[in-house]
Amino acid sequence: MASSISAAEVKVVPEEYNFLQKHVAFFDRNKDGIVYPSETFQGFRAIGCGYLLSTFAAVFINISLSSKTRPGKGFSFSFPIEVKNVRLGIHSSDSGVYDKDGRFVASKFEEIFAKHAHTHRDALTSKELKELLKANREPNDCKGGILAFGEWKVLYNLCKDKSGLLHKEIVRAVYDGSLFEQLEKQRSSKTP
């Protein structure tokens, strides 16, 4: 049976997007290059987060990133995030896996597991995740520390296995956004 959706109606992520832009583009639900709080909310719901977390994430993320990703533009109460400029919103106290331009730095990614995966070579336990966050925390950087903590805790809670391990391939997939697509597909296949 042929699909009722034409090729012109399907909006895809531009091929030239870097890893960080691809990560954020999942939340651009209509693929217009701008992420509004309602889209952030929809994206978090699509990957399996509850209403409260999705609401908090939409408000906090969009308020935090909107003005940073819209240089030279005035304040907007709709708190849009421009995907093309998301690199301008990279926060401190992070892992360094995204460089200043939003590109993936493989050596920094490998360093996460080389330094902090003590129990299993290719996975992090909750304790090891706390160690990672502590090691990456910059002095007097409350905001960056909170952002990093929130990102990693959501990832851990959504994706840890039955043994409480967050596997390397899962972490890798979050950096380019492909994990979000996988989670949405898994969730939609479970609902009637």
Curated annotation (Swiss-Prot):
UniProt induction comment: Not regulated by abscisic acid, desiccation and osmotic stress.
Molecular function via GO: metal ion binding; plant seed peroxygenase activity
Quaternary context: Homodimer.
Cofactor(s) needed: heme b; Ca(2+)
Catalytic activity, reaction form: RH + ROOH = ROH + ROH
EC number: 1.11.2.3
Protein name (database record): Probable peroxygenase 5
Binding site for heme: H23
UniProt xrefs under SUPFAM superfamilies: EF-hand
Tissue specificity statement from the Swiss-Prot or TrEMBL entry: Expressed in roots, leaves, shoots and flowers.
Species name: Arabidopsis thaliana (Mouse-ear cress)
Protein role: Calcium-binding peroxygenase involved in the degradation of storage lipid in oil bodies. May be involved in the interaction between oil bodies and vacuoles during seed germination.
